[in-house]
Amino acid sequence: MSKKKLLFLPKYPRKGASSRLRTFQYLPLWEKMGYSVTVNSFFTEKYLNTIYDHQSPGYWHVLTCYFRRFSLLFSVQKYDLIIIEKEIFPYLPAFAEWFLSKVNQYWVDYDDAVFHNYDQKDNFMVSLLMPKKIDHVMKMANRVIVGNDYLKKRAEVAGAKKIEVFPTVIDPKKYKVKEDQSPFKTITIGWIGSPSTLKYLDPIVPILDWIHEHYPIKFLLVNGKSKMKFKGRIESIPWTEDGEVDAILKMDIGIMPLPDNPWERGKCAYKLIQYMACGLPVVASPIGMNKDVVIHGENGFLANSKEEWISALGELITDPQLRKEFGCKGREKVLNEFTMEGNFYRYKKLVELELGD
């Protein structure tokens, strides 16, 4: 029997977090199960590196990405199933998805609220001409895969045929557990993220400054070349895929502040899942999926106001036993609900059902 052929169309190469976690980390498992897998990322690693360096990737380079993806459409019929991350062509109408729905079957995957790039975009022409672009992509798909309930609700409103929730998860084999929660040391509060999300730390800097004045802390920023305006001691570590777990293990407390905006409500709380996989206690804003991952007072704290953040951080800084208890409960939750293999075998059953295996 010939191998079933899967075509994955992620937005980014492996270096892009969403594509790495929603597509690339599963590829060895698909191949191990006997599937023939082809991957075609829309943007290139050169594009990502340019964006992360806060530079423009250049008109011609971006145009090349569009042409390369367009040429792929002439060979889509040879695949048994096509799985798209978000959309085929960013900021173009859903003509490609319409074409695909006529000649093959496709699924589409979302781990953030990309539909707000269209219905709440500052660009007047985008909002005017394509406010429901992602809704159309969802409706034409055979199945919509989403990372959380906020995205699921949008797929329901769009009229998606079938919807499945698959959280963004970790491979637990890669995540060691932090052991040292000694009371006799400087406490490291940490954050991991891409340069584009560093802005989420801005509102919390005054809180960290206050904490620094009252407790022995330092701040660890796993963020590449970016900096933040913190009055206390700060350590900045460039992000690498191979080094991210070791970087998290340098932390004692992991944080995930977020504003209460539509885009942020669609986030999948991946930072928290990473922290908790390493046995860290967490403090997070009660926004979107953060409220599902953090059980307040059991594996971390949810904090909204300045007073709540100060109280939560202060309690964890001064109580090593509480840090350990929260960390154990957090890791347990991750192992039960947010693992790569758990996701994969559910996903595989759906593919088998779709293809009649």
List where the protein language model places each region.
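Conserved catalytic-core segment of nucleotide-activated headgroup transferases in glycan assembly
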Residues: R14-L29, V39-N40, D171-Y175, S182-L249
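Donor nucleotide-sugar binding/catalytic pocket of nucleotide-sugar-dependent glycosyltransferases
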Residues: S41, Q105-W107, V114-F115, K139-V177
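Membrane-proximal helix-turn-helix segments that form the acceptor-binding/catalytic region
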Residues: F67-Y79, P90-V108, D112-F115, F124-V144
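Acidic donor-binding loop of glycosyltransferase active sites
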Residues: N142, I248-G266, L280-P281
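Short acidic/histidine- and often glycine-rich active-site loop of Leloir-type glycosyltransferases
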Residues: G266, P286-G297, F301-L302
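Short hydrophobic beta-strand element within catalytic cores of glycosyltransferases
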Residues: Q274-A284
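Conserved acidic donor-binding segment of nucleotide-sugar-dependent glycosyltransferases
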Residues: I295-E307, E315-Q321
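A short, well-ordered alpha-helix in the C-terminal region of glycosyltransferases
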Residues: E315, L322-E337, N343-K349
